[in-house]
From Swiss-Prot:
Family membership noted in the UniProt record: Belongs to the UPF0502 family.
Domain of life: Bacteria
Organism: Burkholderia ambifaria (strain ATCC BAA-244 / DSM 16087 / CCUG 44356 / LMG 19182 / AMMD) (Burkholderia cepacia (strain AMMD))
One Pfam family linked to the record: DUF480
Protein name as it appears in the record: UPF0502 protein Bamb_4889
Membrane spanning residue stretches: none
SUPFAM superfamilies: Winged helix' DNA-binding domain (SSF46785)
Amino acid sequence: MNTTPDMPTPRALRELTPLEARILGVLVEKQHTVPDTYPLSLNALTAGCNQKTARSPVMNVSEDEVTTAIDSLKHLSLVMEGSSSRVPRFEHNMNRVLGIPSQAIALLTILLLRGPQTAAELRLNSARLHGFADISSVEAFLDELAARAQPLVIRLPRAAGARENRWLHLMCGEVNVADFVGPDTGGGTDSVPPSEFEALKAEQKRLADEVARLNALVQRMATELGIDVDAPGDAG
């Protein structure tokens, strides 16, 4: 799985912003999924950044914000602007700048667009970018990306209750692993966030109060009608 002899020497890069990372992911994705419209116009690139499906997190950015991020990526040689069209169009240059093969680019792209993924999820979600024969081949490329002098991905510890480890990109810098693994509950089950737990307690109290109010209403109506609601019903 090593890079070929003619693969460019990887360059050291600064940390990317979340929007810069999203732009790179969109450019690679659309290069494979809609090749007829690639390189992308600013409008198409912005739409891809704000896409609601296959994105985590979902963004809502303007063309001005995308333009600013593109200019920064140009300085890093990660994005190039075509000159053959009256409408500016943009393409990525990740293979040459990062010095990694297309298979690794495909995996990195999915992580840029969708957030943490297991190797199985990466194989499934990258199918339109590259067809991996099996999960072990996916893991081999991921291991290479993680073993670089400047690692591009990290393998997260297995979360409580999870069957597989997830992988996360490091294009935006080092991460706090605990933010993605979550607390160990010791019981192998997913933990409930404190805010959700408080909401459940409030809902439980509201329902209990409603039941008490209805019981009082029934008792009052029964008294007015002379009915003993505690008496057993007729057997026959």
